[in-house]
Amino acid sequence: MTARILDGTKIRDEIFAELKEEIAALAEWGLRPGLAAVLVGENPASQLYVKSKIAACEQLGLASWLHTPPTGVTTEWMLELVDDLNRDDNVDGILIQLPLPAQVDAKRVLEAVSPAKDVDGFHPVNMGMLVSNRPGLVACTPAGCMEILRRNGIALAGANAVVLGRSDIVGKPMALLLLHANATVTVCHSKSRDLPEIVRRADILVAAIGRAGFVQADWIKPAAAGKPGAAVIDVGTNKVTDASEAGRLLANFPARLERFAAKGNALVGDVHPDAVNTAGALTPVPGGVGPMTITMLMSNTVKAAKLRRAAGLSGEGRSKPARTAR
């Protein structure tokens, strides 16, 4: 039986339509949420990511600013820029694109961002808000995973949920979100024992470990006795360039193998592609979780604008123009 495909692109379009309505309603009150992105250096992947985020802002009607400090920037210089953005009433969200150059203390820079403008949801204050189940800004990828589950009618309360990965960016916040939704949550990592058996008990599996095809198809709970198979959320986006590895992972997908031969690479998730024949529902790679990350960044920017104004935290006063804006 082929799994039901959990299409992240479709859900992105639904949420974008909802956000456009929210943004239009805010505009009637003279409010236009805005996102400031900070990109250091010439990393092609980072440039592409930021370009996509700015394009999403333009599509939705959000204000956006791109700040491009030079590669040789210091930690202190970055902290001054963040302080300027924290004080700017027009800026509702601040995005620091990672990685930063080696000479910059990324932890200090990220933690200098006002929690009220931390639209990535990485600040310790926002993590604490999530732990205590209070309104705040949640890390974008886990928030997107929850939207996929909820909008596809996946039952969360009482479900056995397994999260593979314990990173601060995905694994830990994902586990907390599932816990707050009344799932019974198990978090696994590199030291976990009997991993296949743990995964086989999962009604919901979230894989976020960064290893192509690590979760085997026969680890996934199949449909049985009228109950659906596991819902699988595959966060991994791994570029496979080795022909033998591609052949092993894509042996049952001749069209994808043909594309690999033409391009020299293929994107594969953390779950073996053959799981499409075992799982009850499955996010594709690409086209599953990926589109949701930028979507939730946009959602967080709108949410930050509303939360800050409701709390009277519209800013600390207008500052001098932020550095390197363009």
Name what the model sees in each region.
Residues 96-103, 211-213, 237-240, 288-289:
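Short glycine-rich anion-binding loops that position phosphate/pyrophosphate groups of nucleotides
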Residues 77-89:
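Short, well-structured alpha-helical segments in soluble
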Residues 28-32, 155-156:
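Short, flexible coil/linker segments at domain boundaries that flank nucleotide/cofactor-interacting
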Residues 2, 9, 15-21, 25, ...:
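Adenosine-phosphate binding glycine-rich loop
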Residues 35, 57-72, 185-187:
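Short beta-strand elements in bilobed, periplasmic/extracellular small-molecule ligand-binding domains
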Residues 40-55, 135-253, 263-273:
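Glycine-rich phosphate/diphosphate-binding loop of Rossmann-like nucleotide-binding domains
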Residues 95-157, 198:
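Anion-binding alpha/beta catalytic cores of soluble intermediary-metabolism enzymes, centered on
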Residues 1-11, 104-108:
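Helix-enriched interaction subdomains in cytosolic or periplasmic regions
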